[in-house]
Amino acid sequence: KGAPFYDRDGNGVYDPNVDTPSFRDADCTATPDVCDANADQVAWYVINDLDEGAVQSLYGSKPIGLEVQNTVWGYARTDALGDAIFKKYKVIYKGTETTPDDAVIEDMYFAQWSDPDLGDFGDDFAGCDTELSLGYVYNSVDPDSHYRTFDLAPPAAGYDFLQGPIVEAEGEEAIFNFRKRSGFRNLPMTSFVFFAAGSAISDPDLGEYVGTEQWYNLLRGFQPQPDIFNPVDFVNPLTNQPTKFTLDGDPTTTSGWNDGIPLPAGDRRIVLNTGPFQMALGDTQEVLIALVAGISSEAPPRTVRTTV
């Protein structure tokens, strides 16, 4: 139980002088680099949605019986690997006492939501890179008032879907539990949305079921409106075309749709989504995310992309 480790001596007990903070279920023969990753710190925790009062006070939905086991690890290094924190989410559909045996979640999505507050929260920009499945935040001005105190250039930070949930795909191959699985593929980031605090588009409503409906639209790449049957698109202001990937331009070359149009810099939220996928009662899915950061004299978005 608890944070996973590679039990090198096979005694079933973690010995920091012998064992390695790693992943007990990894295939160490096929992927020895996983077992020898030698993370300098590994943390593990588990959460579920069975507290009906707590769950409904968030967005009004009732529990459905999801358990999430989260493993977080990092490295004390001076290279790019030391600028990343890794998070593996293991999602299990366990159900509740009233869940029927044949229950299936038909259209499930996974989101990485963030209120990044990069230094001074009032001067942030956001963006995404669809090829890297990356959503990021960077500073609109140089210097940032918080980092100027330390004589540092503004950094950039982002979240990257390294391994999305798996769906059936004939002839393809996915990674699941650090093992290859034939006949499946890993979903990439399927939409990226952002909104600015205080603007017309803001956080879903807390404490009411309408918040759940707004979130379901966000998860599918639409605006957080409550009508799930008639969702409202985000629109690229340069092309006037609907899009599920907001701010997908390149701020280092100023090509495409970049933040600052039409909203000024400010307090941003970013939401990276992947889906849909199905989960039958008893099924397990995994999502592996890297939180990456970079600080350099280069343009900050380029810095975080280079780190990825």
Which residues are covered by each model-predicted region?
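Extracellular/surface-associated beta-sandwich interaction domains
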Residues: K1-V308
